[in-house]
């Protein structure tokens, strides 16, 4: 990243649902090619993510989650969503961490992750967990370099295909 460029975060609002959905879909289209069916990635993923984020951001319980948008010089390039899961023994769910493909490797993922960590600490929680699609080697490598630990795998269904979701945890330092 050029030294004079500014990477910043801002809270997401309901008005950002379509924007978040477009980043989410673009990330999946680039990352999940070969892991999920092309017909899903090239077709319904855009509409599916738009409906998902519209519903999620308008649903009650917003105090249980943080959604932040990363911007580079005011241009949205990524987002993070973390949510308290009171019934979970695993802690706070880092549910989404996505950067547009052209902006990966410039520190946006780390910035978004730190925002989720800070929010988790402020909630009095000591651990985050996430699921990553088996075969998503770049994301797995990123999480492991950040100190996340693999703790298990679960069957799931995504994009019309049975998949394996790998669970990782990250214990926050005090």
Residue ranges and their predicted role:
Residues 2-7, 11-14, 25-102, 110-119, ...:
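Acetyl-CoA-dependent GNAT
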Residues 13-16, 136:
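Acidic/polar helix N-cap motif
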Residues 19, 111-112, 138:
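Charged catalytic carboxylate motif
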Residues 20, 24:
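Hydrophobic pocket/interface hotspot
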Residues 89, 107, 138:
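Residues that form or flank phosphate/diphosphate-binding pockets in enzymes
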Residues 92, 126-141, 145-174:
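C-terminal "cap" of GNAT-fold acetyltransferases
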Residues 100-102, 106, 134-135:
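Active-site acidic-Proline motif in GNAT/NAT acetyltransferases
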């Amino acid at each position: 990243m050029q030294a004079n460029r500014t990477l910043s975060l801002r809270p997401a609002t309901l008005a950002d649902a379509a924007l978040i959905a477009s980043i989410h879909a673009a990330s999946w289209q680039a990352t999940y090619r070969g892991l999920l069916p092309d017909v899903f990635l090239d077709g319904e993923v855009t509409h599916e993510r738009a409906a998902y984020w519209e519903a999620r951001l308008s649903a009650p319980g917003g105090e249980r989650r943080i959604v932040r948008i990363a911007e580079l010089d005011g241009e949205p390039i990524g987002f993070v969503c973390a949510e308290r899961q009171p019934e979970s023994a695993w802690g706070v769910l880092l549910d989404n961490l996505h950067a547009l493909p052209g902006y990966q490797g410039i520190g946006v993922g780390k910035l978004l992750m730190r925002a989720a960590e800070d929010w988790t600490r402020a909630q009095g929680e000591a651990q985050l967990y996430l699921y990553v699609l088996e075969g998503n080697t770049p994301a797995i490598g990123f999480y492991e370099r950040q100190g996340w630990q693999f703790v298990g795998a679960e069957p799931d269904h995504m994009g019309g295909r049975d998949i394996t979701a790998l669970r990782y945890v990250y214990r926050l330092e005090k």
